[in-house]
A protein has these predicted regions:
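Active-site phosphate-binding and catalytic loops of NTP-dependent enzymes
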Residues: 81, 104-113, 262, 481-493, ...
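Charged catalytic and DNA/RNA-contacting regions of genome-maintenance
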Residues: 1-343, 347-351, 356-361, 375-388, ...
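Cytosolic, long alpha-helical scaffolding segments
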Residues: 434-444, 506-522
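ATPase nucleotide-binding head domains, primarily ABC-like/P-loop NTPase cores
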Residues: 29-32, 241, 310, 321, ...
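Charged, surface-exposed helical/loop "interaction arms" that form contiguous linear patches used
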Residues: 389, 393, 403-406, 460-461, ...
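C-terminal tails and terminal domains of large nucleic-acid-associated
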Residues: 864-900
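Extended, charged coiled-coil "arm/hinge" scaffolds of SMC/Rad50-like chromosome-maintenance ATPases
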Residues: 528, 532-566
């Protein structure tokens, strides 16, 4: 047996192996020690192998999912080896085989998965971009290939990007597990990835290294074509994504290995381009608290506020819409249209009518009826996957049957509103139950057992042989009562009993007082202290028949259930289309409910550059104020267009500058994803990215101070923001001297205004920056209001024109509970500093043009040009130490006038 275990373990050296032995899964040697540490289970030794004690630990079969869930949460992978041989016919150890490998990115079991989020598996690989390609910003630029798979949903995707965009992809995909080539074989890619990964802040994902040969582009293209049953990937827009094909090769190999079978539920491919999506860098996802708070919690976030979906698949789709907003506004317009129709259309109003047609005055909006109907639907998406993988449970199929039976009523609810909304009309077509699927599921018992091994899964009347075997088992009690009565009469033993237990089977029990009357045909089976147990030829014959019938009944039922699943697997495409329609309807109904409950309005898209928000609100802050019965939220306007590209925002801490900036970004994001928005009105022009530099945080793990993190993020924004980007800059320049910070803040504001020409909200405590608007016509000063009352301060949280008169830092310190002596000294010192500032010379003009040295006007000579060309071709973020040294030598040669 240990030889068999060691053979299996050799195939999975870095994975915990759960080795099935009867009613337990056993772990041996180092696996047992590790499981003991992680799960706090008992460790023991038994016998010897190769002269060493066999260290072992085990978990019960009936509770294995609980232990698997704990291990997955800790980032472990587990290979489950089941007994596949027949115990009764095996000579020697029963044959065992690994039937699945459970890893964080390949989960399919409902007990291991979170209902409302997806566990994505992502493969990454890089290569040097070809010279002259659009992706190569230098001769040594890296091009990244991505391939991802949602094992539980069948969602498969590929993409390519430059290193600067990789962080955004990691933030939007949020993988649970990452597949990478060995770092020692891809040094440059590994170095670049480590930097990007640290900045993305996604250290919770498990990193799994796969052999370098698995990242092969030709192999990946062939695997993708085989998986999708096509000759070319042209129809998916993925034919020319060679680096992504290499990632897909490793992804599909790993996925098929973990499932020990083909992935028949993976039937489509998405190949989004970074140019199709609004860019949301990791800092934006983090600072806007889209899916997690800054503390890493799931609530309160924008997603937690918005997610009132009735199904898990709806919640997962909502998360995807939120993190994948599209630049093309057509899809968002269709979603707005559907939400408006669900809000306006009364439930029960027939198609071809108008919303103003007479209806039941008590009728609720269509979205409420739709949400009520969705309560009776199950997670069709994940159930269809488990059907494809032959892992589905009886009660999941019962839920699928209930969903199909609810479709006619659900479709009738949608049809009326669908007349005026294209998305609703498309989904209504998918809400027609397939008669063959319903017929197949009709063989299922009305309330099947939770597990197939318990029996009672197939309905009576479906199979004559099964009914006959069940009848034998069901008539068992009647037979035993009849036999007991006959034997009492025949023997005259009044307390004789006929019983059954799992150890000894059927038996006749006679107490000591009646043993002298036991007939000769009674055969002794067991002796007890005060009784004897016997069996007769008649009882033995019945036992053989009954026990055989029970085993044969379970075997027959298992076979019938497997046939049912095989039949359902032929309708996988229809089930997946149904799942997509139900998920989309759930999200649209959720967004309609949120729009009505939170009093959100439909945004309007325009073609010219514009962010025009009337009475905008921060949705999460407003909701928290209402929950805590705090002060009413103060709405604020924001108007940015071709004439006003930048708002310079000043005012006190706690005044609401950051809240105002974040609410503008959230409103832009919500409108772009297809939701209504928390504002009285909203007009929005084209947007290609939302960049943020908000808050302060050290990155100790990567030896970066708060100021370094701030400058790194600001530099990325200056390099990437376009005239269609929205940029939030909050108090840039902190963490260094006032002079340095002020100079940097002024230079950054100038670059954003003159070079990037993006929409910018620039919050600052440097009062000197309020002069920026005097020198730059597209900049405007605004401030958050505050009123002093004696030594107290009242924050108005209102954005008003013009600069703030002061920052009120001392008053805020007093509100924070600072000792009175400290506040008093600070106030006196502040007065002295202000008087001294008034007596000094006028401050240097921060925004005057930089005077160029006289020599700079001259045309650079050939040596200077050679050095400049070499510098322009370098990519410092991707250079290895060796390559950096070689580049330095080339620069020195060029500076000395020799050939580079």
């Amino acid at each position: 047996m240990m030889a068999q275990y060691l053979r299996i373990k050799a195939e999975f050296p870095d994975t915990l192996v759960f080795y099935r032995m009867g009613d337990f899964y056993e772990l041996f040697y180092e696996d047992a020690r590790k499981a003991h540490r992680l799960l706090d289970i008992t460790i023991t030794t038994r016998g010897q192998s190769a002269g060493e004690p066999v260290v072992m630990a085990g978990v019960p079969v009936h509770s294995v999912e609980t232990y698997l869930a704990r291990l997955i949460k800790l980032g472990e992978a587990v290979a489950v080896a089941e007994q596949v041989g027949d115990v009764t016919t095996s000579k020697g150890p029963v044959e065992r085989k690994v039937v699945r490998v459970v890893t964080p990115g390949t989960l399919t079991d409902s007990e291991l998965l979170a209902d409302r989020s997806e566990s994505l598996l992502l493969a990454l690989v890089s290569q040097i971009a070809p010279t002259g390609s659009r992706s190569a910003s230098g001769p040594q630029a890296l091009r990244w290939g991505l391939a991802w798979l949602g094992m539980a949903s069948g969602r498969l995707g590929v993409a390519e990007c430059e290193g600067a965009d990789l962080g955004s992809w990691l933030a939007r995909l949020e993988p649970a597990e990452l597949l990478l080539p060995p770092p020692d074989e891809h040094t440059r890619g590994a170095t670049a990835f480590n930097t990007i990964w640290a900045n993305a802040g996604r250290a919770t994902a498990v990193l799994t290294h796969r052999p370098a040969w698995q990242f092969d582009a030709a192999l990946g293209r062939r695997k993708l074509c085989e998986q999708l049953k096509v000759q070319s990937l042209q129809a998916f827009g993925a034919e020319d994504l060679g680096v992504a094909h290499a990632a897909a090769a490793a992804l599909l190999s790993y996925a098929q290995q973990t499932q020990s079978q083909a992935l028949s539920h993976v039937q489509s491919l998405e190949a989004p381009s970074g140019q199709d999506l609004i860019d949301l860098p990791p800092s934006t996802v983090r600072n806007l608290e889209l899916t997690r708070t800054l503390r890493g919690e799931d609530s309160p976030t924008l997603l937690s506020l918005m997610d009132s979906c009735r199904t898990g698949m709806g919640s997962r789709l909502l998360r995807q819409w939120l993190t994948h907003p599209l630049r093309d506004r057509h899809q968002a317009r269709l979603r707005h249209q559907a939400i408006g129709s669900l809000l306006a259309w009364p439930a029960g109003l027939p198609p071809k009518a108008t919303p103003e047609s007479p209806a039941n005055p008590a009728a609720s909006p269509a979205f409420e009826a739709l949400r009520q109907a969705l309560r009776h639907t199950c997670d069709v998406e994940r159930i269809s996957t488990r059907v494809a993988l032959r892992q589905v449970r009886p009660r999941e199929l019962a839920g699928l049957r209930e969903t199909l039976q609810a479709l006619p009523a659900l479709r009738a609810t949608v049809l009326g509103a669908a007349e005026h909304a294209q998305l609703l009309a498309q989904d209504a077509q998918a809400l027609q139950p397939d008669a063959q699927i319903l017929e197949t599921l009709g063989a299922l018992a009305h309330e099947p057992a939770a597990l197939l091994r318990d029996g009672g899964v197939v309905a009576p009347g479906v199979d004559a042989e099964l009914d006959e075997l069940r009848a034998i088992a069901q008539n068992c009690d009647a037979f035993l009562l009849d036999l007991e009565a006959r034997e009492r009469e025949r023997t005259g033993i009044g307390n004789l009993r006929v019983q059954f237990n799992k150890v000894h089977g059927f038996y006749i029990e006679v107490t000591s007082s009646g043993l002298d009357r036991v007939p000769a045909d009674y055969q002794r089976r067991q002796t007890l202290k005060n009784a004897e147990r016997f069996i007769t030829p008649e009882l033995k014959a019945f036992e053989d028949k009954a026990l055989s019938a029970q085993d044969r009944s379970l075997a027959r039922e298992k076979w019938l259930f497997e046939q049912m699943v095989e039949a359902l697997a032929t309708h996988l495409s229809a089930l997946q289309r149904l799942a997509q329609a139900l998920a989309r309807l759930d999200v649209l109904a959720c967004l309609a409910e949120r729009a009505q409950t939170l009093q959100w309005t439909e945004p309007q898209f325009v073609n010219h550059p514009c962010i025009d928000i009337e009475a905008g609100r921060h949705p999460v802050v407003q909701a928290r104020l209402q929950e805590t019965r705090g002060a009413a939220f103060m709405p604020n306007h924001c108007r940015l267009d071709a004439r006003t590209k930048m708002l310079v925002i000043t005012g006190p801490n706690m005044g609401g500058k950051s809240t105002f900036m974040r609410q503008v970004a959230l409103i832009v994001l919500l409108a772009s994803m297809g939701s209504y928005v928390p504002a009285q009105s909203c007009r929005l022009g084209p947007i290609d990215a939302i960049h943020t530099r908000i808050g302060a945080a050290d990155d100790l793990a990567n030896a970066q101070s708060t100021f370094m993190v701030e400058m790194t993020e600001a530099a990325a924004i200056l390099h990437r923001a376009s005239e269609h980007s929205l940029v939030l800059m909050d108090e840039i320049g902190r963490g260094t001297s006032t002079e340095d910070g002020l100079a940097l803040a002024g230079a950054i504001a100038t670059h954003l205004h003159e070079r990037n020409r993006c929409f910018t909200l620039f919050a600052t405590h440097y009062f000197e920056l309020t002069a920026f608007a005097q020198h730059h016509p597209q900049a405007l000063n605004v401030h958050v209001g505050a009123v002093e009352s004696g030594q107290d301060i009242v924050f108005l949280h209102e954005i008003a024109p013009g600069p703030a008169s002061r920052s009120y830092g001392v008053q805020v310190a007093r509100l924070a509970g600072m000792p009175a002596a400290v506040v008093r000294q600070a106030r006196n010192t502040l007065g002295s500093l202000e008087r001294r500032a008034l007596a000094q010379q006028p401050q240097v003009d921060l925004f005057a043009g930089v005077a160029a040295p006289a020599a700079a006007a001259a045309e650079p000579n050939s040596t200077a040009r050679a050095v400049i060309e070499l510098l322009e071709g370098l990519q410092p973020d991707t250079l290895s130490p060796r390559e950096a040294l070689e580049a330095l030598y080339r620069l020195k040669d060029a500076a000395n006038g020799s050939s580079a």
